Amino acid sequence: YKHSSQLSINVKIIISSVRVLIDKLNINLKLKNGVIMSVGIIGLGAMGGAYARNLLAGGIAVHGFDPDLSAQKMLTEAGGTPQSDYGEWLRDCEMIILSIASTQILADSINKLCKILKPGQVVLETGTFTLDTKQAAKNDLDNCGAVLLDCPVSGTGAQAAVADLVMMASGPENSYLKIAPLLEHFTKKVIYAGPFGNGSKLKFVANHAVYVHNC
């Protein structure tokens, strides 16, 4: 019985790994064959706007929401599609990037996304917030079946403009691998740090090291 149980677990792991590989290959094939994929971005400021422009330059369709009219104009001029609010358009995105400035806006965004997203959709939270804030957002998305990855970035707005960012990604590895090829369009390097929250922990350590160095 013990052997049979272990065999069953191993088979499930293999099946899960194969599915992840297929998902990743599908994205790579779409990119290679010029199939237009869509990424949604919430927040089109200095960082989110840079993500959008670099993704568009890589042939990825970008839909974005930002209440700032100048941000909407920027996205239009870059070749993207600005949206007037959260909506069904988010359900067609391969991934959704959050580039948000405050905990309140993050909480509001997560609440709205929970009412729209399909099970299994991947959301990247790229800001620097407390672990408690990130965990609360993750719990809410878990409850509606979507997946949140903790993906803070290291770099300035100027570096973001030329895709010279380091991303510290954490969360379910299968979800990370599924969207990893898309990250190459707006980052220089992505470090997969393991379980959810490790990305932020790594970012905090990096920030502290910079602070100590500059003291």
Language-model features: locations:
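Rossmann-fold NAD(P) dinucleotide-binding segment
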Residues: 86-148
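NAD(P)+-binding Rossmann beta1-loop-alpha1 motif at the extreme N-terminus of oxidoreductases
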Residues: 32-98
